[in-house]
């Protein structure tokens, strides 16, 4: 419906497992990470930009920032009755939000524009009262409430404007790759032997078969996190021993959450 509204063509991408694994490997190399959630979600963007490049598109618009600016994440609903806490958490998101689309766009030489991240628009969005960003409709609680209301005049708006929030990996189907790793990639014995070896030798905690595959792929390109001098700072992640350089609650290298960084004394 949205493509028709703007006179554009809607393209559906179908990706086989081996193709997805190649995409994930490139994401790991580009972003120096083996964080499963980041890899799955960023692979969605990678696949979309890659397809756009293949069909001759040179510029794309993204919705980056919408969830952060307008309280779109599902977990924020727990703060609905505590507006000061909701506002505090949304402001925290403003300070830590980062998106892979720019890096991926540069890789494919596709210009990425994110209207929500325009400085003037962000100032406007941040000035909107928090009570307008989360609200109730048809006995349900919704984030990005004011954005959804903007589409009420559209035909079939119920189907699109009031669509449930899903992570990119869920809405795209990329999350199904987890089953592949669990059932086809490693035997239980191989998995247990590998995670022990990696923990003992490289000081990295592996949490799943998927995580193991991503780490082994990461090691094709990079040293263990603790051996990368540029990552050694005052704080380090307790799960991977990599440098922890930001104010978020998870490690951007291994995906550990929640993280209490270790203060290094040497």
Regions found by a protein language model. Name each.
Residues 207-226:
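A glycosyltransferase accessory/donor-loop signature
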Residues 2-3, 151, 218:
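Structural element of the ATP-grasp superfamily
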Residues 35-41:
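Short, flexible loop segments at the rims of nucleotide/cofactor-binding pockets, characterized by
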Residues 52-57:
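Glycine-rich phosphate-binding loop signature in dinucleotide/nucleotide-binding domains
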Residues 60, 65-82, 92-204, 227-233, ...:
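Mid-to-C-terminal catalytic subdomains of enzymes
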Residues 45, 49:
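Short, conserved alpha-helix that lines the donor NDP-sugar binding/gating region
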């Amino acid at each position: 419906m949205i493509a028709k509204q703007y006179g554009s063509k809607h393209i559906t991408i179908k990706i086989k497992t081996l193709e997805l694994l190649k995409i994930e490997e490139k994401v790991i190399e580009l972003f120096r990470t083996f964080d499963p959630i980041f890899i799955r979600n960023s692979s969605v963007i990678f696949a979309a930009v890659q397809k756009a490049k293949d069909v001759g598109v040179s510029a794309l618009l993204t919705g980056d920032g919408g969830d952060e600016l307008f309280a779109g994440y599902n977990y924020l609903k727990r703060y609905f009755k505590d507006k000061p806490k909701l506002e505090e958490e949304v402001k925290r998101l403003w300070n830590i939000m980062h998106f892979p689309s720019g890096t991926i766009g540069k890789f494919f030489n596709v210009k990425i524009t994110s209207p929500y991240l325009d400085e003037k628009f962000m100032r406007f969005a941040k000035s909107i009262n928090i009570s307008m960003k989360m609200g109730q409709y048809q006995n349900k609680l919704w984030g990005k409430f004011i954005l959804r209301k903007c589409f009420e005049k559209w035909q079939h708006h119920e189907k699109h404007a009031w669509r449930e929030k899903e992570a990119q990996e869920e809405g795209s189907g990329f999350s199904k790759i987890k089953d592949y790793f669990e059932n086809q990639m490693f035997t239980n014995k191989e998995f247990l032997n590998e995670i022990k070896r990696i923990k003992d030798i490289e000081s990295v905690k592996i949490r799943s078969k998927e995580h193991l595959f991503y780490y082994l792929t990461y090691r094709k390109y990079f040293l263990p996190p603790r051996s990368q001098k540029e990552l050694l700072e005052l704080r380090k992640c307790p799960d991977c021993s990599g440098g922890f350089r930001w104010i978020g609650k998870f490690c951007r290298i291994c995906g550990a959450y929640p993280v209490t960084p270790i203060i290094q004394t040497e």
